[in-house]
């Protein structure tokens, strides 16, 4: 299996590549359009600022490449946010895969700290028709730093979030409930960092590789 990691001006890419290696996959870091299109899986990770990242993607034609992908794609952290319509960060028009906008956390009291940083529970959304969680999240309730019925613990670092929407497949709560993970067609995304989330995160990456 060839797994391509999108090469662009965003941080934390090598942590993702190391997480893939721990699962026996040797990822390819690339910004080549043909290589990305031909890969079996594509990971779109990163930490950074939305407008700077989108400017880079557009200048290098990667925005259209990402939108053209038909294999499973996993956006992580800012990767999830860039797959949405718009971000308040820099008033940025994004890729528009998910029908949602990205907004900034607004503290409601002195105890609310932004950015949100640390471990938090996610709760997978059960599909009302299939009565199952999204395949990306299969088995997550059995892993993570801690355990709770129907929930998993994962690691977050972010100041902006995606409100709960039709594409939400898992929620988290920090200041207010929001989307911890999204899915639409062949695109999947997590606001948290599965590569830093212990056994729960490893399970999510494994699930992605098996989609």
Residues of each region from the PLM?
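Extreme N-terminal starter segment of soluble prokaryotic enzymes
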Residues: 1-4, 186
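N-terminal beta1-alpha1 ligand-phosphate binding loop
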Residues: 3-25, 195-200
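An anion/phosphate-binding loop that grips the pyrophosphate of nucleotide cofactors and donors
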Residues: 39
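Structural motif
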Residues: 43-45
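Cysteine-nucleophile active-site neighborhood
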Residues: 48-120
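Amide-donor transfer/coupling interface in amidating biosynthetic enzymes
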Residues: 68, 101-211
């Amino acid at each position: 299996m060839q797994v391509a990691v999108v090469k662009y001006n965003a941080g934390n890419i090598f942590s993702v590549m190391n997480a893939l290696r721990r699962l026996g996959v040797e990822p390819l870091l690339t910004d080549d359009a043909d290589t990305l299109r031909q890969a079996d899986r594509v990971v779109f990770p990163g930490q950074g600022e939305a407008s700077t990242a989108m400017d880079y993607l557009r200048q290098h034609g990667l925005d259209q490449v990402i939108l053209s992908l038909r294999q499973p794609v996993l956006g992580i952290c800012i990767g999830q946010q860039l797959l949405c319509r718009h971000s308040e960060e820099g008033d940025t028009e994004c890729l528009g895969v998910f029908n949602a906008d990205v907004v900034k956390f607004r503290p409601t009291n002195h105890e609310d700290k932004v950015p949100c940083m640390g471990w938090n529970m996610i709760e997978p959304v059960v599909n009302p028709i299939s009565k199952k969680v999204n395949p990306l999240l299969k088995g997550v309730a059995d892993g993570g730093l801690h355990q709770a019925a129907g929930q998993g613990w994962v690691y977050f670092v972010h100041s902006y979030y995606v409100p709960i929407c039709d594409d939400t497949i898992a929620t988290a709560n920090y200041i207010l409930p929001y989307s911890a993970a999204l899915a639409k067609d062949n695109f999947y995304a997590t606001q948290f960092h599965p590569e830093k989330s212990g056994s729960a995160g490893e399970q999510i990456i494994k699930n992605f590789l098996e989609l």
